[in-house]
Amino acid sequence: MFCAALMCARPLLAANGTVAQADALLLHGLAGHDRAEVAALLDPEFTWIAPRGKSQDRAIVLQNFPSPANATEQIQVREYGNAAVVRADRGQMHVLRIWVRRPAGWRALLYQEVLQVAKSETPGPGSRNCENPCRSIPFTPQIENEKAAIASWQGVMQAMATNDADVYARLIADEFTATDTHHARPFSKSDRLAQIQKLKQTGAHSAPPPLVSARMFDFGDTVLMIAREQRPNGKPYFNTRMWVNRDGRWQMLFSFNTRIE
């Protein structure tokens, strides 16, 4: 089911329809090693990120046919205009699939897995001044929507570094979730706000990790970023984020973080 023009900034929950059908066909093709079926559903820019951080492009996926996790789990689909977010969760394993609407139909742009730890880990220290990513990053967005999404993201990073819950709340969508390898469960917007308030009360700070590199994709009402980040002396990881243009500002929809082992 497609998003009506005036409603594209709001998520459309789809129990079935073209996105879910395309998603089911992709899983079917992967299970049967059907190269033609899978190739027809993968975007030229497609990326597959496995739970230990191994990244494969479209050509390699069509050679190796990796097995998707949680393939039989019920999916949650949210459509945002020309993009759709598919989630399949079971226990500590979480799967994200991003679909984009192309002229020929829906195509898969990203498949990513996060296997969360049984007990949450304490992240290593970041740079206290938060130069990267709060003020400058080693990546230059090319178009206006990308620039606006990056500005919003840096606003979130600054809010986290300074424990500013009000700014954080404005720039985060209500349906936001953060799914990280080093945590035992996903966190909601309210969870994150509670964490910020607790840090503020204790006088502690959480410095965001520096950005190493990024790829961005503009879909009109949404922007996707697949970033590589790394704390000093820590392991790198892929962090995928998506923003939606809603209520006159770009809000983050999710953060999906896979550590590179």
What are these regions (language model features)?
Residues 1-11:
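Bacterial N-terminal signal peptides
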Residues 15-18, 47, 60-96, 193-237:
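Surface-exposed, charged secondary-structure patches
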Residues 26, 37-38, 46, 61, ...:
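Hydrophobic pocket/interface hotspot
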Residues 42, 52-53, 89-91, 97, ...:
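A mature extracytoplasmic/lumenal domain signature
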Residues 45-56, 60-64, 175-187, 198-202:
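A short gly/proline-enriched turn/hairpin at secondary-structure junctions
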Residues 48-49, 86-87, 108-110, 178-179, ...:
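Short hydrophobic/aromatic-rich beta-strand segments that constitute the beta-sheet cores
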